Amino acid sequence: MASLAAMSWPGILPDWSNLHVLHRNTLPPRAHFYSFADEDAALTFNREKSFFHSLNGTWKFHYDATPFEAPIWERANVTGWDNIEVPGVWQMQGYGRPQYTNIDYPFPVTPPNVSYMNPTGSYWREFEVPADWDGQQIRLRYEGVDSAFHVWVNGEEVGYSQGSRNPSEFDITDYLSSEKTNTLATRVYQWSDGSYIEDQDQWWLSGIFRDVYLIPFPRASISDFHVVPEVDDGYKSGTLRANVTIQGEDGDMSIKVLSPSGEVLDRWSGSSSDRYSKRVEGDDFQLWSAETPSLYTILIEFNGRTISQKVGFRRIEMSDSNFHVNGKPVIIYGVNRHEHNHLSGRTVPYEAMRADLVRMKRSNINTIRTAHQPPHPAFFDVADELGFYVIAEADLECHGFGNLEDTEEQAASWTSDNPEWTHAYLDRAKQLVERYKNHASIIIWSLGNECFYGQNQAAMYRWIKRRDPTRIIHYEQDREAESADIYSQMYSSPDEMREHMESHKDKPLILCEFAHAMGNGPGGLEEYIELFRSEPLSQGGLVWEWSNHGLLKKEGDLEYYAYGGDFGDEPNDTDFVMDGLTLSDHTPMPSLLEYAKIIQPVSVALTEDTKQMIVTNHYDFVDLGGLNASWHIVRDGDTTEAQRLELPRVPAGENRTVDLPLDKGALSQEAWLTVEFRLKEDTAWAEKGHVVAWDQLHLIGAAAKRSIPAVARDVAGLEVQQDRTKLRVKNGKSTLGFDLLQGNVTWEVDGVNLFQRGPELYFYRAMTQNDESSEGNMAEWGETKVGMMHTQVRDVAWKTSDNEIVVHFKVRVAPNVLEWGVEADLIYTIAAEEPLLRVRASGEFVGKNKPSVVPRIGFLTIMPEEFDEVRWFGRGPGENYKDSKQACRIGQYVAAVRELYTHYDYPQENGNREDLRWLQVSNGALTLDVRRVGESAPFSFTAGRYMPFDLDDAKHPHELQPLDMTVLNLDYDNHGLGSASVGPRPFEKYQCKTEPFDFTFELSLA
């Protein structure tokens, strides 16, 4: 009987599913640099003037469902292939589909195994090596490929690499042809064993998404260098040290050092085997910090090539349970930044990246965490230049294991505490540190994100500490900071932070993520910043995150920003990717303006006797000499001209008392002193006159009674008419109608229907994305049916006099099914003279299982859509809420109703304005004037074209259809925003509690 030979398939374990193969034939990681022909070219820092040959552009492309069906390069015929742009991800160019998950792996979880059904992109192009590169080593460099790839040159396999957000470099010299055009083929695999530790909260996107290029290295050349600017204990001098690594034979080398102003500080010549050092002191010595980003230039010449690097003197160390920069415990006012572009996904143009960092700087942000992987290398150059502290994070996250286990320890056993994965973890630490070690902006190395904690993080920590003792190390899920120099938490409340600091006094605490900026929110930022500035062990935090991650999706003539599920991707985490301070196109949202205001580096407050003001400098290093101060007065209908404010010197971290620049006794009505601080000179990130900080000080009492202009009106006394279910009150050309059955009110003036509905008691608003989370209030409000409440009239009484008519409704406002409700009195006073209508509402929440809080307490009024101009005196011009209003100044504003709407990528509650003294809504001919009555006169309002449930039902902006009406809400109170999408609900003082209420509005015609 014949026997069968043993057979197997695929025979050899594929590299992309083999934990023991991370790279094949790649060169060691090195500092990122370009080499130039001479010093002048090197000083441009322009890679186009260096020895550099870009392979970006149009490549041929073939897409397959599995690597086993991908073209075999020896027989491949690319003439029928598609074209694709490099850099770019293939999902944004018509292949496969984008997929968004926050935690879950979108593939079977059997690490390190990867399914053989693994989408694969085959790239091909021709290239020529510049003729003057003959005789040199030619390197092929990929700055970023997701998630793994093989490379062929002229049909011969060169090597393999993985680690999506880390560069890979190959020596292709021996594969090149001098007689013909060369071919380059790259096979990219969507998944690899590395995907298990690249489970970051972002879109899964694939392909060659960063630059590809050639660079020549002479046989004897600089292959790496490390510049260490050391700062002496007194922070008045330092030593610049450089260690240069040569491939090939050593030889003569020269080094030149230029000061921040470009003056030559040192010229040195010696052997490439020597170590260079230069003492810098006196006027030549300048410290680098986020506030003073002074950069020196080092030029290193060897064998006809010059490389250039910007370096900064700064010292990072642990001291007295804090981390210090240049001897001071700085506060992090930070933001997390993913690399994302709404048009191209993971491929971010340089101009877009720089624009982001400029906007961050203009928003008073001083720290960026490169969440959760290394960015494009040009990012660090810009951060050095503009002045940012950077937490540079390794390309590591395996959050998905947390959904498979009950404890973090169990989840860590998959990879983080598994010795089989140690090499993979260390590889990512080495890639990060070696490539970016020369950048002044990097003050902290981060071991990754949400990988739990185990022996592999400990191994990373030990390696980094040996390689680079000049920086500190961060890792949030090392709860006891065994392998980290600082404690780190996510989304803790201020009280939770205080509790931690009471029992952990050996190291400082930062929030590597806080204030989850999802949609309309976060609220309560002020409480965090107050804590950062008052508790020495609390050294700041980084808002999650910089921008929404919507991808522009086109469906015919329709364009919108898509999120998880919009591409048919399963599983997905829907809109959780929309959680930034900017919209998907990087337009600032109100939350960014709020953050910029609250973290501003200068603040002004009145002394207790209100006769002087205290100016506080929150900078860590600089005084206020770079700013011009001015002041002006804001009153109802009046703003004075700005005048210069003379300040004494206010050193960093200190305050000074300054006399008020005016006589308060001369003020006869409510007034606000506005103090502004503007740049004296242009900077790299803002022009002269840019407002860095401002404050408003309330100088005098409550708002004065607003004068309503007289309106000619035929007033023949008040007339009352009643039928079975209606009560009508006529006042000349004005008629108010009361529905005795349902409590509805109408108001008609000269044939114009001013009120189509209301004012009626109303307790609901549209949900925010924070409300909708599992920790938000939506569940409670849904269970208690707050949005389904309607008015039941219990009793109506009225009385008349010559000057007014008082209509008194006793009502119950309650949902169906449930027993709880609001017992209220609505008292309408109609007068013969202005104000024509006064509405008083008082009530209490009664019954079982009532909600603890409600979205709002106020009046809902429906007006014709012609009433589309709004004027108010209060906070503006943008939207603001009770726990997010510091960025909006008290003043007088005017806007069309459509301009009050905030265009969030995901429809939700928006457009509120707080602290109003008065409000006017007009159709051009007729104006309704509204104001509160009582001791706490300010109120809030929204005016728009949608009812709350319209916003609740829509999941994208294009699903909204504006109503032919103006929906006006006048609120006595409303619920804060909080950040419960991930984090705390609104703090107690910002909650709209179900407690007794009593408020009055006056409505007049102007």
Where would I find each of the regions flagged by the language model?
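Extended substrate-binding grooves/exosites of carbohydrate-active enzymes
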Residues: 9-45, 86, 93-96, 101-106, ...
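Beta-strand-rich binding/interaction modules
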Residues: 153, 236-270, 278, 298, ...
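Accessory beta-strand-rich segments of carbohydrate-active enzymes
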Residues: 9-23, 45, 60-64, 81, ...
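Beta-strand/loop-rich accessory regions of lumenal/periplasmic or secreted enzymes
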Residues: 91-93, 190, 289, 661-669, ...
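Short glycine/proline/serine/threonine-rich loop/turn segments at secondary-structure transition edges
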Residues: 133-136, 176-181, 281-295, 666-672
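Catalytic cores of secreted or luminal carbohydrate-active enzymes
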Residues: 199-222, 558-614, 618-638, 648, ...
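An acidic-aromatic loop/edge-strand motif
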Residues: 92-97, 104-113, 162-164, 173-238, ...
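Short strand-edge motifs at loop-to-beta-strand transitions and within beta-strands
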Residues: 123-125, 166-170, 274-278, 656-660, ...
